[in-house]
Amino acid sequence: MYWRDRRKKSSSLWASCRALGYVFAGLSLALLLSDLAVRSEPADQFENLTGKLLVATPEMGDPRFAESVIYVVKHNSEGAFGLVINRPIAKGPVGDLLKGFGVESKDAKGEIIIHYGGPVSQNQGFLLHSDDVLLEDSTKVKDGIAMTSDPKLIEAIAHGKGPRQYLFMLGYAGWAPGQLEGEIHAAAWFVVSSDKSLVFGQEAEKKWHQAIDKRQIPL
């Protein structure tokens, strides 16, 4: 379900991505949680965090996640999978993005922003989007938000037929069983409810502060 880069070098967008060290590779979404190599001690039972936001606290010790806001796409006994929603890294014509996937799309219009989705497998692409448009492989998450990893949805966006709200990411954040719970217990993250206005807001630099304003008692 991951998008595959054909290694075409025709776009300035991909040139800027390559400068940041990002390329694409094809892998199976079913392996996301099972491939997490690091295992943690089981933590106390936490509520399911699917569809919620993880907000890095000032005590976050990992600089890769400093002031990050992560949308949790999946959280279960096998671990957790999420996407950083406040780290744009590049912008370019959506037609160039499609060419990078080997998709020739005539009359593709508009530009698209590429976001850093997390430090794991930064060669993998994802669309987090409103669920008004869904494909066969789309995953409905919660509260009107879905995730898709099919370039056909990018093509639909390029022709004005895509979802009303979306973010395109490279990479993801992944946790082994008990790992995320341990980090929350260590006060690296706190958890807040999500809403589409925050997730898909255009001012990425404000999202962390907006999430801070939504702060609840840590789970």
Language-model region placement:
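A short aromatic-anchored loop/beta-hairpin motif
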Residues: 2, 21, 30-33, 37-219
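Bacterial N-terminal signal peptides that target proteins for export
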Residues: 6-24
